[in-house]
């Protein structure tokens, strides 16, 4: 039997020239330490968190005053405070660069394309921050945006942060109730919208939704031109004004930044909302900045002038992560719309034309490219691409292989995982270590990540809960409208005392990497054996006949049985032969325990706005329980397909 080999191994020159290696050497000199290897450095970053995060601040040249203390009450997760004396402004650190080089490059499908230089971006932010101040918006006020992933959105966020206000955003494909479920909780002082957007080659109208949401929020509304007629829409919206009129009275001048405490709120992000009204998760300016600087500069190796792309909407935390790339001087490549319009080459066309250094996307996208028969390795010049990242759901081992066979054989592939809760990653890529098929390379610097069993003991070689045992800067400041912190504590600290339990079912590998087997709350438990749903998806979704799958545990005869729903490829029927083939694939690729008791074909599978399937909502429908918040779904009508199924009555 041939020994397993890594898919990618960094060559010596890459290692020696990487910002990660440079940082390790710098820390050794700065603190008089010698680190034998990366693992030793990671251990130090966790045991000496004050020194480590001070090093990130100093090495990345954060603009602001750090104060004398880096960490207070570090042993208590909920009470820990990083840089309690610090003063800084998030936007000031993202707008340190000037000149005629590209800051933002944008494509809206094949309908719109333009770019902003650093000087143009700074000029726009200057006019916007003056307009915000004239509107009476300052520290602690909320600005809510229902916007595409376009340059104006980045500029508006930066202007909001520059005056100390709090930014919150969603994508324009949210329904009226979905927008209100989010922004209605935070009482924004200003509402920002587009006048339409493009998706799949068609203009999507938002006029009636904008009018209804603006009226309900009762806030002045700024309408940004994109795919409609903002001048015609503005007079029909209560408190409506076009972006041009909003900034008309202000000329670009020197930028003015409000320096505030490290823990001052920067963003309000939202949970998916599939189990109730979305939680409003508040993230700090300092914690977000330091964590993203660490991830971009060291884990991704981003350098000044390189081009960073992430396929995301403004309703997903990866948009916030992408925006922070400006802090290392990277050029952001923005895209809005369908990643398959006009065809599946569109993002690779973009990557080749603009010479992406980092291409970020989702596991679902990689699988769709593979199933679509696209092979960019043969059709595109991706010579500039050195790092590809994948998140949103676990990337299957076959997905790993496809990246190296079909996209680029010498790229570093970093599967990453974290979430809205920390606006960053717990586990991610590492330019100093090999990439192994199906594995995330390892934990982030400064993060005490581990896998624990139900008894709260660390485990190796078996699955358990992904935890973080020590405080870190990008923990939420609080949940909005949670004055006693009860919702916050229940979300992360109910399971283990003084330990963050993230809700992922995970496993360490012999290489020191991590495999995420799915969400803990969606874990299947037939016969008392815990099975991660991703273990089943990894087998089934590699089959050309299966477009998508969703798995639940159904309560049955005092036990739980595994039920697999499949959305089949066009023209395919679920015959007895295909059912046997699916079961055999699961049995041989996973184990006999993973084989579903029932396999049922459905026309569609419900998913969130960011493309994640919703196992818990389907499980509720199957068991006759109400789904609390269908507005959180991109296709809520799909839930009806799972109600009262005859196949599940026997």
UniProtKB/Swiss-Prot annotation:
<comment type="function">
    <text>Catalyzes the conversion of acetoacetate into acetoacetyl-CoA. Is involved in poly-3-hydroxybutyrate (PHB) degradation, which allows growth of R.meliloti on PHB cycle intermediates.</text>
</comment>
<keyword id="KW-0007">Acetylation</keyword>
<keyword id="KW-0067">ATP-binding</keyword>
<dbReference type="GO" id="GO:0006629">
    <property type="term" value="P:lipid metabolic process"/>
</dbReference>
<dbReference type="InterPro" id="IPR020845">
    <property type="entry name" value="AMP-binding_CS"/>
</dbReference>
<dbReference type="InterPro" id="IPR042099">
    <property type="entry name" value="ANL_N_sf"/>
</dbReference>
<dbReference type="Pfam" id="PF13193">
    <property type="entry name" value="AMP-binding_C"/>
</dbReference>
<dbReference type="GO" id="GO:0005524">
    <property type="term" value="F:ATP binding"/>
</dbReference>
<comment type="pathway">
    <text>Biopolymer metabolism; poly-(R)-3-hydroxybutanoate degradation.</text>
</comment>
<feature type="binding site">
    <location>
        <begin position="199"/>
        <end position="202"/>
    </location>
    <ligand>
        <name>CoA</name>
    </ligand>
</feature>
<comment type="similarity">
    <text>Belongs to the ATP-dependent AMP-binding enzyme family.</text>
</comment>
<feature type="binding site">
    <location>
        <position position="546"/>
    </location>
    <ligand>
        <name>Mg(2+)</name>
    </ligand>
</feature>
<keyword id="KW-0460">Magnesium</keyword>
<keyword id="KW-0479">Metal-binding</keyword>
<dbReference type="Pfam" id="PF00501">
    <property type="entry name" value="AMP-binding"/>
</dbReference>
<keyword id="KW-0547">Nucleotide-binding</keyword>
<dbReference type="InterPro" id="IPR000873">
    <property type="entry name" value="AMP-dep_synth/lig_dom"/>
</dbReference>
<protein>
    <recommendedName>
        <fullName>Acetoacetyl-coenzyme A synthetase</fullName>
        <ecNumber>6.2.1.16</ecNumber>
    </recommendedName>
</protein>
<dbReference type="InterPro" id="IPR045851">
    <property type="entry name" value="AMP-bd_C_sf"/>
</dbReference>
<feature type="binding site">
    <location>
        <position position="504"/>
    </location>
    <ligand>
        <name>ATP</name>
    </ligand>
</feature>
<dbReference type="GO" id="GO:0046872">
    <property type="term" value="F:metal ion binding"/>
</dbReference>
<feature type="binding site">
    <location>
        <position position="530"/>
    </location>
    <ligand>
        <name>ATP</name>
    </ligand>
</feature>
<feature type="modified residue" description="N6-acetyllysine">
    <location>
        <position position="612"/>
    </location>
</feature>
<feature type="binding site">
    <location>
        <position position="587"/>
    </location>
    <ligand>
        <name>CoA</name>
    </ligand>
</feature>
<feature type="binding site">
    <location>
        <position position="519"/>
    </location>
    <ligand>
        <name>ATP</name>
    </ligand>
</feature>
<feature type="binding site">
    <location>
        <begin position="392"/>
        <end position="394"/>
    </location>
    <ligand>
        <name>ATP</name>
    </ligand>
</feature>
<keyword id="KW-0436">Ligase</keyword>
<dbReference type="InterPro" id="IPR005914">
    <property type="entry name" value="Acac_CoA_synth"/>
</dbReference>
<dbReference type="InterPro" id="IPR025110">
    <property type="entry name" value="AMP-bd_C"/>
</dbReference>
<dbReference type="GO" id="GO:0030729">
    <property type="term" value="F:acetoacetate-CoA ligase activity"/>
</dbReference>
């Amino acid at each position: 039997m041939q020994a397993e080999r890594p898919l990618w191994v960094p060559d010596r020159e890459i290692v020696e020239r990487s910002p990660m290696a440079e940082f390790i050497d710098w820390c050794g000199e700065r603190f008089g330490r010698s680190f034998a290897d990366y693992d030793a450095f990671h251990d130090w970053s966790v045991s000496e968190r004050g020194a480590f995060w001070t090093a990130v601040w100093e090495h990345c040249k954060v603009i602001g005053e750090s104060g004398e203390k880096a960490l207070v009450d570090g042993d208590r997760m909920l009470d820990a405070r990083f840089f309690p004396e610090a003063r800084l402004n998030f936007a000031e650190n993202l707008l340190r660069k000037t000149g005629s080089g590209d800051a933002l490059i944008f494509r809206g499908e094949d309908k719109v394309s333009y770019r902003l230089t650093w000087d143009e971006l700074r000029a726009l932010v200057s006019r916007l921050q003056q307009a915000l101040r004239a509107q009476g918006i300052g520290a602690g006020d909320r600005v809510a945006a229902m916007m595409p992933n376009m340059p104006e959105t980045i500029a508006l966020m930066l202007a909001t942060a520059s005056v100390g206000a709090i930014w919150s955003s969603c994508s324009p494909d949210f329904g009226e109730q979905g927008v209100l479920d989010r922004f209605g909780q935070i009482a924004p002082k200003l509402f920002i919208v587009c006048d339409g957007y493009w998706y799949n080659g068609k203009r999507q109208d938002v006029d009636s939704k904008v009018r209804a949401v603006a009226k309900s929020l009762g806030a002045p509304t700024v309408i940004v031109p994109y795919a409609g007629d903002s001048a015609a829409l503005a007079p029909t919206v209560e408190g409506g004004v076009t972006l041009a009129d909003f900034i008309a009275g202000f000329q670009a001048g020197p930028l003015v930044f409000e320096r505030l405490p490290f823990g001052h709120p920067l963003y309000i992000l939202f949970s998916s909302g599939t189990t109730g009204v979305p939680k409003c998760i508040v993230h700090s300016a300092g914690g977000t900045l330091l964590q993203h600087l660490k991830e971009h500069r060291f884990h991704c190796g981003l350098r000044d002038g390189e081009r960073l792309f992430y396929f995301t909407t403004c309703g997903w935390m990866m948009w916030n992560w992408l925006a922070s790339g400006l802090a290392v001087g990277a050029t952001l490549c923005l895209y809005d719309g369908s990643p398959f319009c006009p065809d599946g080459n569109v993002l690779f066309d973009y990557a080749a034309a603009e010479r992406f250094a980092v291409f970020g996307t989702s596991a679902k996208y990689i699988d769709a490219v593979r199933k679509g028969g696209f092979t960019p390795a043969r059709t595109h010049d991706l010579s500039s691409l050195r790092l590809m990242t994948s998140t949103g759901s676990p990337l299957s081992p076959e997905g790993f292989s496809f990246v190296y066979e079909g996209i680029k054989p010498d790229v570093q592939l970093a599967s990453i995982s974290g979430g809205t809760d920390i606006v960053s990653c717990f586990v991610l890529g590492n330019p100093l270590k090999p990439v192994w098929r199906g594995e995330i390379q390892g934990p982030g610097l400064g993060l005490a990540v581990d896998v624990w069993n139900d008894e709260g003991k660390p485990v190796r070689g078996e699955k358990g809960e992904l935890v973080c045992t020590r405080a870190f800067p990008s923990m939420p400041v609080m949940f909005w409208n949670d004055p006693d912190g009860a919702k916050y504590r229940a979300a992360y600290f109910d399971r283990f005392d003084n330990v963050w339990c993230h809700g992922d079912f995970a496993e360490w590998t012999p290489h020191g990497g991590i495999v995420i087997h799915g969400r803990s709350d969606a874990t299947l438990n037939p016969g008392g054996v815990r099975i991660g749903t991703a273990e089943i998806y990894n087998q089934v979704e590699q089959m050309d006949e299966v477009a998508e799958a969703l798995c639940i545990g159904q309560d049955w005869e005092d036990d739980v049985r595994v039920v697999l729903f499949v959305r089949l490829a066009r023209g395919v029927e679920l015959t007895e032969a295909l059912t046997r083939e699916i079961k055999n694939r699961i049995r041989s690729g996973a184990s006999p325990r993973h084989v579903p008791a029932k396999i049922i074909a459905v026309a569609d599978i419900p998913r969130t706005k960011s493309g994640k399937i919703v196992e818990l909502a389907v499980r509720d429908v199957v068991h006759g329980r109400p789904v609390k918040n269908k507005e959180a779904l991109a296709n809520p009508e799909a839930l009806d397909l799972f109600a009262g199924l005859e196949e599940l009555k026997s």
